[in-house]
Amino acid sequence: MLADIEQIGRNPRTGGYRRDAWSSADMELREWFTHQAAKRGLTSHEDRNGNLWAWWGDPSVQGPGLVTGSHLDSVREGGAFDGPLGVASAFEAIDLLRGDGFQPDRPIAVACFTDEEGARFGVPCIGSRLLTGVLDPDRARSLRDEQGHSLDEVLTARGRQPGRLGRDDETLARVGVFVELHVEQGRALEAPVGVASAIWPHGRWRFDFRGTADHAGTTAFEDRDDPMLAYAHAVLAARTQAEAHGVRATFGKVRVEPNNANAIPSLVTAWLDARGPETEKVRALVTELAAGADVTEESWTPEVTFDEVLRTRVACVAGLDGHPAPILPTAAGHDAGILASAGVPTAMLFVRNPTGVSHAPGEFAEPRDCVSGVIALAAVLADLTGGGS
Ligand SMILES: [Zn+2]
């Protein structure tokens, strides 16, 4: 299934993917999702926040169901597995259950959450945040991409109705349990399949360092107000302070104005991603770095601890050779975290990543581990929908 979509949004030079939300690549992937649903006789539909759902059974008649899935968008120059592995595995797990003649006692759905990475509009998990009401629809509509297009304009151009964005209780009420399968994004998982215990609290902050543009040659050092220096200090401080606090901090995106090689900049805008096991330490780091910059919090996701009873049960079912699957925390954000925070019983399965590389073209999972992931997911779906084959 991943081979079907391996060319979509791929940079042939680097092998990296660019699948921004609502780009033509994303539209193609959404179509692929709908096609996969139709091929299996699942009822697919797009909710008013742009998330896709493919139902086996009817949740409006049979009550809330078990939802599995992930996302299809990518970071810039991302890998092939982050997101699509969870969507493809969800369809495959349903195939496996049906092949066994399994009849679930409640509906099962495959979900694809829109704009999980936030690569285009800066806020991650836009689809699940809107669905659960943690992202204000007015704020969402006014988010702009680098070309200056607002989400409102982009959705309108794609024939959607941005006026309908916002918390969607009707859709949410259909989700009894959510299980997301995802490629592991570090090297912590040694077994083929693992289960998430928690997601570190994490956020993104925009730092605006302001100065005065001037000539790179004729302006004496004592006359300069160069924001690049403040930015450079912040980058180095982020690293040292993060190590001191036991958290992770990264400036991964920067924009310079006016961006001339022979001029002192007037403005350096940089984005800090910071996360760690303890909220206070992440917060303390951001406060320490804020000197000399105007700081705007663009997103914040509190720590998520997955339902303990559910994760223990999932680990038992997803284990191999009679051993429960290992349970581990993750430093990566996921739609599963947003749903868990909204009170939906939620679990996550991870598929081993041999190199730990993620959000980069080298992201990889062995095909046999992906198959183990599908088998584990199918076993979890069967266990949670209680029927027998
Ligand atoms: Zn992901």
Model-flagged regions — what are they?
Residues 10-57:
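A non-catalytic alpha/beta surface segment that caps or lines the substrate-entry region
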Residues 215, 219-244, 351-389:
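His/Asp/Glu-rich mid-to-C-terminal helical/loop segments that flank catalytic regions of hydrolases
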